[in-house]
């Protein structure tokens, strides 16, 4: 399926709108055209060819990029106030691996296990190695799994060669050891911190088990107990669009532990605040959340405001006068029109402040 493949068409970035209506890069996907050209988080995209970002909404920009798949697009962007120009060719990219390098450690965010995740992860690890990084934060939160083969490939970049990644038991009771892949080389880390939550499942848990059993105290898990999916399924599609899924095996960690219906308990338990697990509905152009009104986005808006420390007296779908004052204070402090109302532009910009 497309979700397992993890593919999309574009430049290979995710972005948000800032107060100047520039498209600010929030993430760059490994091995995408943007990644190959050196775009970085916080770069502000000013224009694409003759299309000025400040005069167009995100839907128009996205449509323009997709319409130019395989064609060169001139990108003008700002980095730390200095203007740069480069040519990018929109194309298919994998959306599962993001790599960031910070002072003293690297971060890899793995959103799922797709067909291409293994090679993209390997490239990210090589990048960390070339930068002299010896500590890794591996973010598996909300990663529900995917291809087990990708879990084998990714494990091969982290644990010694010829190691057991997991054991599977078929319905006859026969056990088979699944080993690391020879074509992927281990990049040794002194410390790996794995972030997990209740939505970390399946192939993600295979990876956690492989790391814990093979690397021992070098690995620390942080978050909440993982989902606990210790079985393997096969999906059979039918011509009418429906499909049939059935279980073919159960998997165990290298040391023989089953986490099915139990999950992995973290070494350090950390509960996320409500704001970190609250999503919002898409803002349309004309949507405005005004004080003393009811709106589906008023709930997440007030939850985010409260998380950021602004005055809020409720967290339901009613946007109160007090919450509007809190939003106005936020807007004033961030160079926005202090209206106390939330529209698409102000909403997206300030939501990025939270995320």
Predicted features along the sequence, with ranges:
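Gly/Ser/Thr-rich loop/hinge elements
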Residues: 94, 145-195, 199, 231-235
